């Protein structure tokens, strides 16, 4: 556990910065991102928002790519992704 007095304010640990609210970080950055999701059936790549609020289907084979949750969208098992 890191005490508040032991933190270097100019170079805070990455794990502490990641847990902070997006506006209270040393450099403000959003928690959301766009990602390329590869379909497991036809290998078609679809761009999906990480916090998508709707079900995303593949454009070619109509396979379910991700389902919404309360926060980040849950990818279907077998789908691979990369951040944009």
From Swiss-Prot:
Keywords: Host-virus interaction, Metal-binding, Ribonucleoprotein, Ribosomal protein, Zinc, Zinc-finger. Pfam families: Ribosomal_S27e. Its cofactor is Zn(2+). A zinc finger (C4-type) spans 39-61. GO terms for cellular component: cytosolic ribosome; cytosolic small ribosomal subunit; nucleolus; plasmodesma. GO terms for biological process: translation. (Microbial infection) May interact with Tomato yellow leaf curl virus (TYLCV) and papaya leaf curl China virus (PaLcuCNV) C2 proteins. This interaction prevents activation of Jasmonate signaling, thereby facilitating viral uptake by insects vectors. Belongs to the eukaryotic ribosomal protein eS27 family. This is Small ribosomal subunit protein eS27z. It comes from Arabidopsis thaliana (Mouse-ear cress).
């Amino acid at each position: 556990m890191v005490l508040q007095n032991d933190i270097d304010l100019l170079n805070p640990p990455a794990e502490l910065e990641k847990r902070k609210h997006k506006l209270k970080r040393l450099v403000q950055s959003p928690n959301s991102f766009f990602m390329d999701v590869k379909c497991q059936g036809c290998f078609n790549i679809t761009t999906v928002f990480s916090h998508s609020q709707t079900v995303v289907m593949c454009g070619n084979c109509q396979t379910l790519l991700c389902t919404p949750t309360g926060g980040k969208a849950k990818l279907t098992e077998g789908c691979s992704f990369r951040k944009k």
